[in-house]
């Protein structure tokens, strides 16, 4: 997934940082300027990076040039685990990551990726509101400040081969990100063997058929051209791709209170605007894939089996990854 992950964060943040362009302002004195080194898997020149730059202009405007973002895009800093490690080591200051990356910092956040738990946007909004303070404290306790949440469309199963019920995955090669215990457990519950590789290896894996099935949004599949290697798409979704942006706590609190407020406010406004774009574009991508000839799979006749696998996955992860109180 250099490509998927790139797409993933392209999407997940699609809007994670959209903000109207601001007027340019004079640079602050170099001795007073704070540069936030921000790691992203989004490719240079992508729509996401254009949005990131718009966020940066607004941040610079709001802080009168005292704070700005410096982007390290295209996975130049590695995968999400590398981002988090480098932020902790002081080599980076912030990163945009998926729930998998967020879970490396605060493991209970992975509950948001549990299959079948959050499948509609209104559910996501309620859950995000209800758990935001709790998760924010978890991030702080682990040395990070949560800047915002983002999303990247509805998670669906895509495959090169036909499928309809959970049992069909036993003869397929489903990908599970090596740092994601949630989907890997889901695959194990079904009785299949997940292909556990890092994000940068996924696209090549599809080319060589090392793997043939992936959980991804229609938006990501179109943006990264995955659809050219995938033939089947589930009509029903397993969840919603969720992620966010985090910054090292020491870096954040080194800013003045005014600049902290500007950073949080601009990122939050951007994220919410981006959510609207992600939802719209994911729906358009879904329709586009159907028009391009991908075979739509109706999994509803086997809903009971899918729901049972999802419920067993959540049960298995409760107490090991997240607490029952989060469900």
Language-model region placement:
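N-terminal secretory signal peptides that target proteins for export/translocation
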Residues: 1-5
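N-terminal secretory/targeting leader peptides
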Residues: 25-123, 135-327
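An acidic, glycine-rich surface segment that forms the CoA-thioester-binding/catalytic face
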Residues: 129
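Bacterial N-terminal signal peptides
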Residues: 9-21
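Intrinsically disordered, low-complexity segments enriched in glycine/proline and serine/threonine
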Residues: 6-8, 176
């Amino acid at each position: 997934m250099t490509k998927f992950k790139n797409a993933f964060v392209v999407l997940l943040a699609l809007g994670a940082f959209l903000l109207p362009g601001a007027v340019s302002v004079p640079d602050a004195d170099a001795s007073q300027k704070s540069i936030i080194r921000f790691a992203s898997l989004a490719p240079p020149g992508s729509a996401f990076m254009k949005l990131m730059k718009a966020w940066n202009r607004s941040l610079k405007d709001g802080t009168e040039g005292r704070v700005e973002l410096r982007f390290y895009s295209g996975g130049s800093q590695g995968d999400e685990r590398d981002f988090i490690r480098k932020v902790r080591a002081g080599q980076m200051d912030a990163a945009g990551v998926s729930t998998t990356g967020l879970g490396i910092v605060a493991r209970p956040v992975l509950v948001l990726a549990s299959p079948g738990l959050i499948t509609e946007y209104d559910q996501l909004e309620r859950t995000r509101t209800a758990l935001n303070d709790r998760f924010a404290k978890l991030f702080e306790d682990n040395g990070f400040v949560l800047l915002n949440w983002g999303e990247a469309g509805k998670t669906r199963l895509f495959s090169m081969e036909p499928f309809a019920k959970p049992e069909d995955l036993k003869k397929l090669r489903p990908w599970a990100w090596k740092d994601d215990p949630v989907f890997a457990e889901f695959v194990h519950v079904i009785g299949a063997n997940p292909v556990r590789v890092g994000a940068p290896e996924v696209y090549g894996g599809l080319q060589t058929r090392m793997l043939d099935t992936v959980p991804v949004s229609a938006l990501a599949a179109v943006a990264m051209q995955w659809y050219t290697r995938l033939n089947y798409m589930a009509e029903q979704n397993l969840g919603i791709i969720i992620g966010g942006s985090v910054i090292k706590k020491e870096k954040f609190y080194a800013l003045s209170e005014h600049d902290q407020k500007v950073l949080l406010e601009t990122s939050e406004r951007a994220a919410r605007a981006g959510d609207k774009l992600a939802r719209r574009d994911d729906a358009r991508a879904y329709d586009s894939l159907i028009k391009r000839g991908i075979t739509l799979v109706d999994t509803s006749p086997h809903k009971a089996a899918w729901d049972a696998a999802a419920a067993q996955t959540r049960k298995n992860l409760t107490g090991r990854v997240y607490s029952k109180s989060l469900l």
